[in-house]
């Protein structure tokens, strides 16, 4: 094979490089987002339950925004949407995990969160 010269194009080299990187476990950056799993346990510094609700209330009131308030039962009865019913199949779609979503329990109970993250949940 003397005298054989291999010529590689840029596209070929990029393909080979990406293939090697993916095979050794290097993954593209996905940002700071991480979803919670049903099997996750609360973080030791996470805040959960009524303590989390109180903390959000405090964070929202300390940022000059109106605090979260519990709804009144009478107000719930006046809700024009209260008589709308969904089929079981349709209702279950709301319970399945949606890709790319997170919530306050995931952000502040399953792991510790910042004041800035808490304030994102102010009404």
UniProtKB/Swiss-Prot annotation:
The keyword Lyase does not apply. Residues 68-69 form a propeptide. Pfam families: Insulin. It is found in: Cytoplasmic vesicle, Secretory vesicle. Residues 1-31 form the signal peptide. Belongs to the insulin family. This is Molluscan insulin-related peptide 1. It comes from Lymnaea stagnalis. The lineage of its organism: Eukaryota, Metazoa, Spiralia, Lophotrochozoa, Mollusca.
């Amino acid at each position: 094979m003397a005298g054989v010269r291999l010529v590689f194009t840029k596209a070929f080299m990029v393909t080979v490089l990406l293939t090697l990187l993916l095979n050794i476990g290097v993954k593209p950056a996905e940002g700071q987002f991480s979803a919670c799993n049903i099997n996750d346990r609360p973080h030791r510094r996470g805040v959960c339950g009524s303590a989390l609700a109180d903390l959000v209330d405090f964070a929202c009131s300390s940022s000059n925004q109106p605090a979260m308030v519990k709804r009144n039962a009478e107000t719930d009865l006046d809700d024009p949407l209260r008589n709308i019913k969904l089929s079981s199949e349709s209702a279950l779609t709301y319970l399945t995990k949606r890709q790319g979503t997170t919530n306050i329990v995931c952000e502040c109970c399953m792991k510790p969160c910042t004041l800035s993250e808490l304030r994102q949940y102010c009404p």
